[in-house]
C-alpha cells in the first residue's frame, strides 16, 4: 500500500475563495441598487445584468457543482425574496 502525499497549494484556496467574494459583493451591490431604485423595469434590468455578470465570472472560476449550489444559495434565493417583497409592497 502506497502513501501518496497530497499538497494543497495556495492557488487552490484562492480560486475557491475568489468566487465566494465575488458572489457576496455582487449580491450586496444588487440588493442596494434594487432597494434604492423603485421602478420595476429598471431594477429588474439591473438585477438581470448583475446576475449575468456574476454567473459568467463564477462559471469561469468554479466546478459545475459548486457553481450551481453557490449560485442558488447566494444569488437567486435573495434576489427572489427581494423581488417578491418589492412586488407585494407596490400593490
From Swiss-Prot:
It comes from the Viruses. Keywords: Early protein. It holds the Pfam family Papilloma_E5. InterPro entries: Papilloma_E5_alpha. Belongs to the papillomaviridae E5A protein family. This is Probable protein E5A.
Amino acid at each position: 500500500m502506497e502513501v501518496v502525499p497530497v499538497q494543497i497549494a495556495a492557488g487552490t484556496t484562492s480560486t475557491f475563495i475568489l468566487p465566494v467574494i465575488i458572489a457576496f459583493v455582487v449580491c450586496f451591490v444588487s440588493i442596494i441598487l434594487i432597494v434604492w431604485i423603485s421602478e420595476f423595469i429598471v431594477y429588474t434590468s439591473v438585477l438581470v445584468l448583475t446576475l449575468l455578470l456574476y454567473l459568467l465570472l463564477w462559471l469561469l472560476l468554479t466546478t459545475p457543482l459548486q457553481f450551481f449550489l453557490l449560485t442558488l444559495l447566494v444569488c437567486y434565493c435573495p434576489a427572489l425574496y427581494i423581488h417578491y417583497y418589492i412586488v407585494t409592497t407596490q400593490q
